[in-house]
Amino acid sequence: MLDKLETELKIRGFSEKTVGAYLYHNRNFLTFIKKEPNSVDENDAKRYMAYLMAERKLKPKSVNLMLSSLKFFYKEIIQNQAFNAVKAPKVEKKIPTVLTKDEIVRMLEATSNPKHKLLIEFMYSAGLRVSECVSMKLDDLDMAEKMGKIRHGKGNKERYIILSNNLITHLNEYIPGKKDSSAYIFSVNNRPITIRQAQKVVKEAAKKAGIRKRVFCHALRSSFATHLLEDLSLIHI
């Protein structure tokens, strides 16, 4: 029966990682409930949700991922209504860390490595996710048009970003050392730096700048959005 799930997921273009996760969560549920899929009812579904939350003490976000996998199979593939009435647990929203403009400047001033400084500026100035930033290549940039292309953003979607005048100036100072247009902007031995390495750079910069907030890469993106709302002219800086 799960073969149908795998086939449908592949037809709809889900990634290999997502296909594997959906199959994994559905197998775990069937192992727990000890029934054939067509025999599963609403009580079974709720009992499993209670088990995940109360006994395994999984966080709502993790449970919701599992629930999405199960609902897709039972509702979309075999038209079983067992999970229709099961509501997703509420996920507590974390308040993002937002840095002041002064703190951003202090982080940049505290960073002596040119590549690390540009990495911080790029994420903040263009509002990039860390995964997007580390995967950027030189040929994703159009300096003349002051634009950049994100090829694999959230949901694997493409989008364009605006490059500020300051960022373009610093990119032009940094790029001459890179001759291959298909090269990653931020790389080590011709490979992109990892997300963990980028997080370490940002965390270290905040520490050197004397910032006591919990600062990770996403704080730069959150700060960009906040500052942009406060002053739309920043987009042209």
Role assignments for model-derived ranges:
Residues 1-234:
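Conserved catalytic core of the tyrosine transesterase superfamily
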